[in-house]
């Protein structure tokens, strides 16, 4: 079985310069979601029909799908015709590029029905409480499908039909190649409809089957930003429910946003307005949020992160982060560390049991075990041309309001006096003070 993705349309109601299918639903372009569903269903080769700003779709599917170009967007039937020279298998499945919630299991069921019945076409249908905008499935008195009529071409009686066409089909490739050139644009849109293949097949006595999907949300399309937001919410809701079934507590599933590739351990509690993105892995027994964003990071067990942003970092077990901390790419935090309020850490290692409690910037640094870094400490890592490393060894104590001008090394168990600006290394167990002496002028105020 080979597949065709219809991805040529502009999507006028999206009010965008981008093709509709490249808009993202929960971190992933719609057309990529459809492609992955096809591959997950066992489709061995995919042809994507592109048109409006085709290079944007090609960027996403390059190396994945064969690209067929529809220079003029003349309807779904014409798009399928454009793809036909690239289809080699006996059967083909055709899917719109704007159905991002579609499951591979649904496509598998459609393919199975098509192959087992030997039908020339099999249509995936669905019953909707509000079928407005969808093509209706018209059946005869015996329940056999006789045609699919689009909303704009339907009679008042046909508009009362609740069973709709999802726009997803399996076809016998040979007969489809024969029928597509016969389509006519005799409709309100003056387009060539793929749906018109069905009555032409029936006229020739060819078997047409249907299979009905139960979960209507899978086949929801996207025509505007409102629908895009609704489907995005659906993806996040599906992920949240799956995690809750696996032992994760989510205080308010409507206000958390967890990507599909995110892994979360049991007994973790997630508070509102928390974003877990990319390939993030969260351990067990953690407390995340509220108002926290974690992207492409690994978090250990029993760690608490609140009101903070963590991007491409690794955080160990029993770590406390926040509120208002920012861990930037390349940061690694060992077990038992405290990263407090208004602390920014960039491309640094913080050793086990160390503390950076307040108002500090730690960049391009290696911090050992059991180090205490006082409020207002800055690693001055950039000289205007290059970034330099700061090393703070085990047990060191850095006083508040200290500037460490890199490259610099603070030895084991050394102490740095508050208010110092250091430009030279500090030996082990030494006290370093680099500030002016205090002078009190008696009777200064008259």
UniProtKB/Swiss-Prot annotation:
<dbReference type="InterPro" id="IPR005835">
    <property type="entry name" value="NTP_transferase_dom"/>
</dbReference>
<dbReference type="GO" id="GO:0006048">
    <property type="term" value="P:UDP-N-acetylglucosamine biosynthetic process"/>
</dbReference>
<feature type="binding site">
    <location>
        <position position="400"/>
    </location>
    <ligand>
        <name>acetyl-CoA</name>
    </ligand>
</feature>
<dbReference type="GO" id="GO:0008360">
    <property type="term" value="P:regulation of cell shape"/>
</dbReference>
<feature type="binding site">
    <location>
        <position position="346"/>
    </location>
    <ligand>
        <name>UDP-N-acetyl-alpha-D-glucosamine</name>
    </ligand>
</feature>
<feature type="binding site">
    <location>
        <begin position="6"/>
        <end position="9"/>
    </location>
    <ligand>
        <name>UDP-N-acetyl-alpha-D-glucosamine</name>
    </ligand>
</feature>
<dbReference type="InterPro" id="IPR018357">
    <property type="entry name" value="Hexapep_transf_CS"/>
</dbReference>
<keyword id="KW-0677">Repeat</keyword>
<keyword id="KW-0479">Metal-binding</keyword>
<feature type="binding site">
    <location>
        <position position="150"/>
    </location>
    <ligand>
        <name>UDP-N-acetyl-alpha-D-glucosamine</name>
    </ligand>
</feature>
<feature type="binding site">
    <location>
        <position position="375"/>
    </location>
    <ligand>
        <name>acetyl-CoA</name>
    </ligand>
</feature>
<dbReference type="InterPro" id="IPR038009">
    <property type="entry name" value="GlmU_C_LbH"/>
</dbReference>
<keyword id="KW-0133">Cell shape</keyword>
<dbReference type="InterPro" id="IPR001451">
    <property type="entry name" value="Hexapep"/>
</dbReference>
<feature type="region of interest" description="Linker">
    <location>
        <begin position="226"/>
        <end position="246"/>
    </location>
</feature>
<keyword id="KW-0012">Acyltransferase</keyword>
<feature type="active site" description="Proton acceptor">
    <location>
        <position position="358"/>
    </location>
</feature>
<dbReference type="GO" id="GO:0003977">
    <property type="term" value="F:UDP-N-acetylglucosamine diphosphorylase activity"/>
</dbReference>
<keyword id="KW-0963">Cytoplasm</keyword>
<feature type="binding site">
    <location>
        <position position="98"/>
    </location>
    <ligand>
        <name>Mg(2+)</name>
    </ligand>
</feature>
<keyword id="KW-0460">Magnesium</keyword>
<feature type="binding site">
    <location>
        <position position="328"/>
    </location>
    <ligand>
        <name>UDP-N-acetyl-alpha-D-glucosamine</name>
    </ligand>
</feature>
<feature type="binding site">
    <location>
        <position position="435"/>
    </location>
    <ligand>
        <name>acetyl-CoA</name>
    </ligand>
</feature>
<keyword id="KW-0548">Nucleotidyltransferase</keyword>
<dbReference type="GO" id="GO:0019134">
    <property type="term" value="F:glucosamine-1-phosphate N-acetyltransferase activity"/>
</dbReference>
<dbReference type="GO" id="GO:0009245">
    <property type="term" value="P:lipid A biosynthetic process"/>
</dbReference>
<dbReference type="InterPro" id="IPR050065">
    <property type="entry name" value="GlmU-like"/>
</dbReference>
<feature type="binding site">
    <location>
        <begin position="381"/>
        <end position="382"/>
    </location>
    <ligand>
        <name>acetyl-CoA</name>
    </ligand>
</feature>
<comment type="pathway">
    <text>Nucleotide-sugar biosynthesis; UDP-N-acetyl-alpha-D-glucosamine biosynthesis; UDP-N-acetyl-alpha-D-glucosamine from N-acetyl-alpha-D-glucosamine 1-phosphate: step 1/1.</text>
</comment>
<feature type="binding site">
    <location>
        <position position="70"/>
    </location>
    <ligand>
        <name>UDP-N-acetyl-alpha-D-glucosamine</name>
    </ligand>
</feature>
<comment type="similarity">
    <text>In the C-terminal section; belongs to the transferase hexapeptide repeat family.</text>
</comment>
<feature type="binding site">
    <location>
        <position position="418"/>
    </location>
    <ligand>
        <name>acetyl-CoA</name>
    </ligand>
</feature>
<comment type="function">
    <text>Catalyzes the last two sequential reactions in the de novo biosynthetic pathway for UDP-N-acetylglucosamine (UDP-GlcNAc). The C-terminal domain catalyzes the transfer of acetyl group from acetyl coenzyme A to glucosamine-1-phosphate (GlcN-1-P) to produce N-acetylglucosamine-1-phosphate (GlcNAc-1-P), which is converted into UDP-GlcNAc by the transfer of uridine 5-monophosphate (from uridine 5-triphosphate), a reaction catalyzed by the N-terminal domain.</text>
</comment>
<dbReference type="InterPro" id="IPR005882">
    <property type="entry name" value="Bifunctional_GlmU"/>
</dbReference>
<feature type="binding site">
    <location>
        <position position="20"/>
    </location>
    <ligand>
        <name>UDP-N-acetyl-alpha-D-glucosamine</name>
    </ligand>
</feature>
<dbReference type="Pfam" id="PF00132">
    <property type="entry name" value="Hexapep"/>
</dbReference>
<keyword id="KW-0961">Cell wall biogenesis/degradation</keyword>
<feature type="region of interest" description="N-acetyltransferase">
    <location>
        <begin position="247"/>
        <end position="446"/>
    </location>
</feature>
<protein>
    <recommendedName>
        <fullName>Bifunctional protein GlmU</fullName>
        <ecNumber>2.7.7.23</ecNumber>
        <ecNumber>2.3.1.157</ecNumber>
    </recommendedName>
</protein>
<keyword id="KW-0511">Multifunctional enzyme</keyword>
<dbReference type="InterPro" id="IPR029044">
    <property type="entry name" value="Nucleotide-diphossugar_trans"/>
</dbReference>
<dbReference type="GO" id="GO:0005737">
    <property type="term" value="C:cytoplasm"/>
</dbReference>
